[in-house]
Regions:
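Basic- and aromatic-lined ligand-binding clefts that recognize polyanionic substrates
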Residues: 22-38, 126-172, 239, 244
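A short, structured surface patch at a secondary-structure boundary
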Residues: 22-86
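Short secondary-structure boundary segments
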Residues: 28, 85-86, 179, 196, ...
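Short helices/loops that flank or line small-molecule/ion binding pockets
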Residues: 70-78, 98, 185-193
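Alpha-helical, coiled-coil/dimerization segments enriched in small aliphatic residues
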Residues: 49-53, 59, 159-182
């Protein structure tokens, strides 16, 4: 396995000096959004079915990170394969043994998105575009912070999640003490005492952040939760994931939504 990881890192280090890829296969929806924002749409030939491509985009949607198939991947003839940070090492090794160049995205952390952006910018020779996007993700933090708990697919975003920088830009922080994503637990939520709660529903559409009457009603019926100030004062909001909340450049628009939320928060 050591030779595989050394080969992977060597490629990532040298990729900026190589010819840019002409056929990219992406197993990461967040990376796909970043490629689009970098201006590399025409180079994308294969993605997952969850990737935020326009309906008319010619790329095949055959990349499946949960059940990958090498023969199907090779049919797309990629010269670069982008794998998510949670990719099975054995799958990455199979790709390398088949002669495919790969990039493995960063392990999740507060700076993982900007590091991925820099890496993908170098790989596609779109360094200037990557620098411009990073400048938007690196905007100074707003005054605050107030605490906002993000709940998504039964998990709560902690201070080590990739969402932390965009929360800071809007003057928020996670009320949790540690972790990337923590399983939703009502007692832990009560202990965290968030100033507001944002529920993200996994849907392909991008929607604004708005007050959620259904989530408000749900939380008001839970004995250990209904006494929270954020519940009593109706500071319960919801949005859809779309492409804006994925770990990629789409977070620039998520940051704008959070900034608007901070203006109306009671």
């Amino acid at each position: 396995m050591r030779w595989f990881w050394l080969g992977c890192f060597s490629y990532c280090a040298a990729v900026s000096g190589a010819e840019p890829p002409h056929r990219i296969a992406s197993y990461s929806p967040g990376a796909t959004q970043t490629l689009l924002d970098l201006g590399s749409s025409a180079q994308i030939v294969a993605t997952t079915r969850w990737c935020p491509l326009p309906k008319t985009h010619p790329a095949v949607r055959t990349c499946d990170a949960f059940n990958p198939d090498l023969e199907t991947l090779l049919q797309a003839k990629p010269d670069l394969v982008i794998l998510p940070r949670l990719a099975n090492p054995l799958w990455a090794e199979r790709c390398t043994r088949a002669g495919l160049k790969i990039i493995i995205l960063q392990t999740e952390g507060p700076d993982s998105v900007t590091r991925d952006l820099e890496l993908l910018g170098e790989a596609t020779h779109q360094q200037a575009a990557a620098k411009a996007l990073r400048a938007q993700l690196d905007r100074p933090a707003a005054s605050g912070p107030r605490t906002l708990l993000i709940v998504w697919d039964g998990m709560m975003a902690g201070p080590d999640a990739y969402t932390t920088p965009v929360l800071k830009q809007a003057g928020f922080k996670s009320p949790l003490q540690a972790g990337t994503w923590v399983k939703l637990d009502w007692e832990l939520l009560v202990q965290a005492k968030p100033d507001a709660i944002l529920w993200i529903d996994s849907k392909p559409e991008n929607t604004p952040i708005s007050p959620s009457q259904s989530r408000q009603k749900e939380l008001s019926q839970i004995i250990v939760v209904k006494e929270l100030k954020s519940v009593k004062t109706s500071q319960i909001y919801a949005t859809t994931s779309g492409s804006h909340w994925l770990p990629g450049s789409g977070l620039i628009l998520a940051s704008e939504k959070l900034t608007e939320l901070s203006k109306v928060l009671k």
